[in-house]
Structures are given as C-alpha cells and as structure tokens.
Swiss-Prot record:
The active site is at R339 (proton acceptor), D633 (proton donor). It comes from Mycobacterium tuberculosis (strain ATCC 25618 / H37Rv). This is Malate synthase G. NCBIfam families: malate_syn_G, PRK02999.1. It is found in: Cytoplasm.
Length: 741
C-alpha cells in the first residue's frame, strides 16, 4: 500500500511529496502550499481535456479501421482516401504561411549545428556522461572503434598499440587539413604551435605558416610562445588541439600533440520517456532526483573503470585566452533538454479522490519544469552551474497526434509557468514528428506552438509504428527491413525539413533527424550518417558520447546553414506520398522468408522486453538474431510488435506461429544474456516468465493497443513483476544499462 499525503483533491505518494518539498522546492522561492494548490488546480482543469484528446484518437482510428474493412481487397483510391481523411477531421486545412516567433533561445539550438544525445535520466552515470559529452576525444573515438580497421598490425589489444595510434593521428591530421586548412603545408607535418600578434603560427620542417582563414583561430591555453592547447572553429563548432610533449602520445608526435578534442554533443535530451522504465512513484522520483542533480550541478555517480574507483561529476566550463588577449569561457556541458512523456499514460505517483491515476504528462510538465528552475541561475542553493544562459527551459514532447494536441501541451506549459511564477513562454517545446497525424498536419502543429517551438525531429522509429497501426486494417505491410525505402518515409524526412524551414527555423530552431541504432558499427555511421546534415538537419540523434564525437565530423564537412539556405522555399513531398500506405504488393514471401521475419522480430521483442520487465532497463544494447548490437527502446519495440500484429491480423501468420517463434527465440536470448548475473532465463518455463508473457501479449493483442503503443502492457507487466519480486527476494534491479556510456 502506497503511503500518501492528501492535498486538495489529490493523494500524492509520500516519496514524491517529500522529494518536492525537501529537495526540489528549496532555492526556487516558491511556497510549498501555493505550489501544491497549483498542481491540484492544473490537474483538475486539464485532465478532462487530456482525456478528450485520447478519445478523439480512438474515434478517428475506429473510423479509419472501418473504412479499410469496407474497402475489402480493392486498391486504394488516393483521392477518395484523402477526401475521407479530410471529412473525419484527420487531415486538416493547411494554415497560411507564418514564421515562428520563439525568443530567448540558446545558440546551441538556434545557430550551432551538431549531434544530439538521448539518454535515460534514471541512470545517473549515463546522464552525467551525456551532459559531459559536449567535448570528446577524437583520438579515443577513433582508437576504440571500427573507424580504424584492425588490419596491418593495427589491432586494439590490452595496451597502447603505436601502429594503431599512428593511424589515428594520421586520420585526425587529415580532418584538420580538411576543416581548418593551413595557408600552405599540412598539419601532418607540423612541428610546433605558437601564437604571435594574435595569429596562430604553425611550424613546419622548412618554414612557418598559418591558417588559410585566420578567423578560424579562436583561442588558446597556456603561454603564447608555448601553448598547451590551440582552439579552432569551423561551422560554429570548436576543435581543440591538446599539446603535451611528455604524454604517451605526445612523445611520438613531432608537434607534441596528445589529442584533438571536438565539440561534440551540443545538446542532450535527458529522457523520461522511451528509454526508461518508470512505472510508479519510486521510479519517477529517481528520475526527478537525477534531473535535479543535473540542474543544480551536484549529481555524482561512483564509477569503477579498469579497477580504479572514482566519482563522476559534471564538467566545469572551459577557459581560454582570446587571440588578441583577454579571457573567455565556453560551456563545458551539453545544453540539456528534458523529454516528458506523452499524453497517454497515467502514473500512481498521484491519484485523485476516486483513486484514478493522474496523467503522467501533466505531472512531468509540473515537476520537470519546477526542477529546471535550478538550472537557470547559479547560487549557493541552486549550485554553481547553469543550463540555459537565456533563461529558457527546454522540454521535448513526444507522441502528439495533430495540432490540437500540440496546442494542449502549450496550454499545459502556460499553466505550469503560472504555478511556478515564470514568465510566459519560458518553457519551450520540442515537437517530435513521430505520429502520422502530426506529419500530415505538421505546418498546423508548428503554428500551434509558434511562440514556443525550438525543434522538430523525425522520430522514424515510432513514426513507422504509427504508420503500421493507423492502417492496420488496410492489409499486410512490407517487411521491416523494406520499410525504410517506402515512398512515405522518404517523403516524411523531406517534408519535415521543408516544413521547418518554411516556418523560419533556420537560425531560430533545430531541425532534427533520428537515431543511429547500430552502436558498435561506427565506421558505417561515419560513412552514412552524413546524409542527415546534407539533408538540412541541424542535429541528429546518436546513441553514445563516442558516437557524438564521430558524428561531429559530419558537421565540419557540411555547412548546414548553407544547405538550409539552398533548400529554402522548396516543397519536395506531396500529401499523396505521405499518405501512401506501405502495403505488400502481393504475398510473395516464401515460407522461410516469413519464418525469418517472424523470428527476427520475436528475438528483438524478447531481447528488449525481458530486461524492461525483469530489470527495469528501458534502453538496451540488444544483440539481434545475428548478434549485432542494436540500440533498442520502446520505439523499436513498437515497430516489431505492430508488424507481427499486422501479419497476424491478415493471416500471413497465426498465433501458433508467434508462440512457436517466441519459444525458439527465448533460449537464444537467454544465451545472449548468460553473462548478466541479474538475468532470469525465460526458457523452458515460458508461462512462468512475466517477460515472456509480456512479449507474447504485445504481439497477440497489438492490433487492439491504443495507436500501437507498448507502454500499457509494459507498465502493467513491470508492476506485476515488482509485486512478485516483493514477495520473493530476487537479484538486484538496475535502472539503466549500456546504451550511452
């Protein structure tokens, strides 16, 4: 039984109430009684609106399902389909042209293009790593990944391999030549660096030279005649050459260079949503407490690395000498967003007088907004660090369907600002373009938040899940691997960029693109993810600090501002392309192809769900059926479960096929997790495993889940597991894993 405190019409879990009163409110100048009265009023006023929006989702889906069932096997008449979607209010009139008016936004969002990390906030170590990933070692990122092949004697090994190190150095020198070229010669031939008359002087074997563009010299540390680092800038991103002739690497370098540091994760999303498993008050408070520590600057995590124990804390800002003299400071940490949950879920952290749980999205806005106040100014109580230098709070809002839901979020933020005594529009919104009704009405969605919006982002993983569920009754969908080449998804990516630029995002807000999920395949990422900035994205998601440093290379190669200028005024996608349903043209799959698809998806589902339900791990590096590590979260789970639910609905497979595949894949997943002491095998007692049953339920009842979301089943099953574990002691739980080291 949860211990609760009554406040007005609400009953608040004691653990949350005490955290807010004793930890979150001190330092904000907000009276506790006034705050809780405001919470009570916001919940009372906005809960009916929230529920009405969910009802509208269900009503629209029911009408779409009915339309497709009536169509039977006839080809889709696109004109009739578009007219139908317009008549039911799914497809709305496009508003007149406009420009967003959001003000008070940090430069990391408005003008600096670069990588964006997403990290589970329930794991303090990962959150700290992500916040500190503003700056990353290029040498480490190259040496430790497959970007440098382990051939010709360049294996990693347990100790430093000079052959590999030399290849790293050569790669980095080539990067410098390409990004901040010298007026003559190459960084590869440099023998020293000095600063003379405010200019960088680079010594070569036979002469001295400088930068081809002297304006790319941004500063230095140490003495001008013998600097310990040289700071350069390209496309708004900083590059720092560290010089230490006595270091292990520096002793092998003619110029004494020991590393090249790149400005990497410019922004980071601290996530309360898809990458976490927060199902009750205790889980929510863990996340809120970590968010508080990040904003106050006092979050710390004990780390044991190679037998050495230390305390990880937030990095301080970085101090430099300007080329012409005088000191300046650069941020030492990534600018933080916080991702709240969407409109669907409730949480028992607060219940009303009837015992009904309060909508979690309303709670998140109130409590993450309150906590973020500590990141707006430094003080003895708030700590020495600040997040936003312009006084803004940045909240990513996911899984919104259409402009009415965006408008509701803006109203919620406005009401929260009143409760917190903040100026209107302090709380900015990042709009995830990851639901089909938002995509086809994106211009209207942006207009609904024109004075708050700071980013739009194509979440293609969730977006694919909604694409499948929306048209569940239309027929069997193409295989998961084929989905990325479908007309709708190509149009979707272009449409997002074009809509953002048309609304004036360039120089005002981020245009973002999705995650690289193959966490170990960094060479492939370096080869292919450059397509995102080339497409006009000013940021794109990466799964780790190392990936952020490597993806930063792309923003030196691509001038995103120039790309956006070239795309301005274009409209590359049509509504017909966006509405093209990814149906299989014919059921031409051989039985072994069907079995392969089912096994691949069942293995992926089991590999993710077993850690979610049994260990509370919301974001995992899950080996696929071929043992390739993939970053999995609820978005990838949504795709896999919805595709199989669709095939089940249309007779491509049977429930017996699903069960047989799950039973085949469970032992494989058990073997892949054999090294985890907290892991509980699913085989051979499948029906005794709550995780196995959750995976099965996600598929068999996938067609009936609201918009295909996995949260209702996951939350219920995780609570079931927690209740069972409370009755019978089990191995220790964990709040995160290795998704973002």
């Amino acid at each position: 039984m949860t211990d609760r405190v009554s406040v007005g019409n609400l009953r608040i879990a004691r653990v949350l109430y005490d955290f807010v009163n004793n930890e979150a409110l001190p330092g904000t100048d907000i009276d506790p009684d006034s705050f809780w009265a405001g919470v009570d009023k916001v919940v009372a006023d906005l809960t009916p609106q929230n529920q009405a929006l969910l009802n509208a989702r269900d009503e629209l889906q029911a009408q779409i399902d009915k339309w497709h069932r009536r169509r039977v096997i006839e080809p889709i008449d696109m004109d009739a389909y578009r007219q139908f979607l317009t008549e039911i209010g799914y497809l709305l009139p496009e508003p007149d042209d406009f420009t967003i008016t959001t003000s008070g936004v940090d430069a990391e969002i408005t003008t600096t293009a670069g990588p964006q990390l997403v990290v589970p906030v329930l794991n303090a170590r990962f959150a700290l790593n992500a916040a500190n990933a503003r700056w990353g070692s290029l040498y480490d990122a190259l040496y430790g990944t497959d970007v440098i092949p382990e051939t010709d004697g360049a294996e990693k090994g347990p100790t430093y391999n000079k052959v590999r190190g030399d290849k790293v150095i050569a790669y980095a020198r080539k990067f410098l030549d390409d990004s901040v070229p010298l007026s003559s010669g190459s960084f590869g031939d440099a023998t020293g660096f000095t600063v003379q008359d405010g200019q960088l002087v680079v010594a070569l074997p036979d002469k001295s030279t400088g930068l081809a563009n002297p304006g790319q010299f941004a500063g230095y540390t140490g003495a001008a005649e013998s600097p310990t680092s040289v700071l350069l800038i390209n496309h708004g991103l900083h590059i720092e050459i560290l010089i230490d002739p006595e270091s292990q690497v520096g002793t092998t370098d003619r110029a004494g260079v020991k590393d090249v540091i790149l400005e990497s994760a410019i922004t980071t999303i601290m996530d309360f949503e898809d990458s976490v498993a927060a199902v009750d008050a205790a889980d929510k408070v863990l996340g809120y407490r970590n968010w508080l520590g990040l904003n106050k600057g006092d979050l710390a995590a004990a780390v044991d690395k190679d037998g050495t124990a230390f305390l990880r804390v937030l990095n301080r800002d970085r101090n430099y000498t300007a080329p012409g003299g005088g000191q300046f400071t650069l941020p030492g940490r990534s600018l933080m967003f916080v991702r709240n949950v969407g409109h669907l879920m409730t949480n028992d952290a607060i219940v009303d007088t009837d015992g009904s749980e309060v909508f979690e999205g309303i709670m998140d806005a109130l409590f993450t907004g309150l906590i973020a106040i500590h990141g707006l100014k430094a003080s003895d109580v708030n700590g020495p660090l600040i997040n936003s230098r312009t006084g803004s709070i940045y909240i990513v809002k996911p899984k919104m369907h259409g402009p009415a839901e965006v408008a509701f979020t803006c109203e919620l933020f406005s009401r929260v600002e009143d409760v917190l005594g903040l100026p209107q529009n302090t709380m900015k919104i990042g709009i995830m373009d990851e639901e089909r009704r938002t995509t086809v009405n994106l211009k209207a969605c942006i207009k609904a938040a024109a004075d708050r919006v700071v980013f739009i982002n194509t979440g293609f993983l969730d977006r694919t899940g909604d694409e499948i569920h929306t048209s569940m009754e239309a027929g069997p969908m193409v295989r998961k691997g084929t989905m990325k080449s479908q007309p709708w998804i190509l149009a979707y990516e272009d449409h997002n960029v074009d809509a953002g630029l048309a609304a004036g995002f360039s120089g005002r807000a981020q245009v973002g693109k999705g995650m690289w999920t193959m966490t170990e395949l960094m060479a492939d990422m370096v080869e292919t993810k450059i397509a995102q900035p080339r497409a006009g994205a000013s940021t794109a998601w990466v799964p780790s600090p190392t990936a952020a440093t490597l993806h930063a290379l792309h923003y030196h190669q691509v001038d995103v501002a120039a790309v956006q200028q070239g795309l301005a005024g274009k409209r590359r996608a049509t509504i017909e392309q966006l509405l093209t349903i990814p149906l299989a043209k014919e059921l031409a799959w051989a039985p072994d192809e069907i079995r392969e698809e089912v096994d691949n998806n069942c293995q992926s589902i089991l590999g993710y769900v077993v850690r979610w339900v049994d260990q509370g791990v919301g974001c995992s590096k899950v080996p696929d059926i071929h043992d390739v590590a993939l970053m999995e979260d609820r978005a990838t789970l949504r795709i896999s479960s919805q595709l199989l639910a669709n095939w089940l609905r249309h007779g491509v497979i049977t429930s017996a096929d699903v069960r047989a595949s799950l039973e085949r894949m469970a032992p494989l997943v058990d073997r892949q997790n054999a090294g985890d002491v907290a892991y509980r095998p699913m085989a051979p007692n499948f029906d005794d495993s709550i995780a196995f049953l959750a995976a099965q339920e996600l598929i068999l009842s996938g067609a009936q889940q609201p918009n295909g979301y996995t949260e209702p089943i996951l939350h219920r099953r995780r609570r079931e597991f927690k209740a069972r574990a409370a009755e019978k002691p089990a191995p220790s739980d964990r709040a995160g894993d290795d998704a973002a080291r």
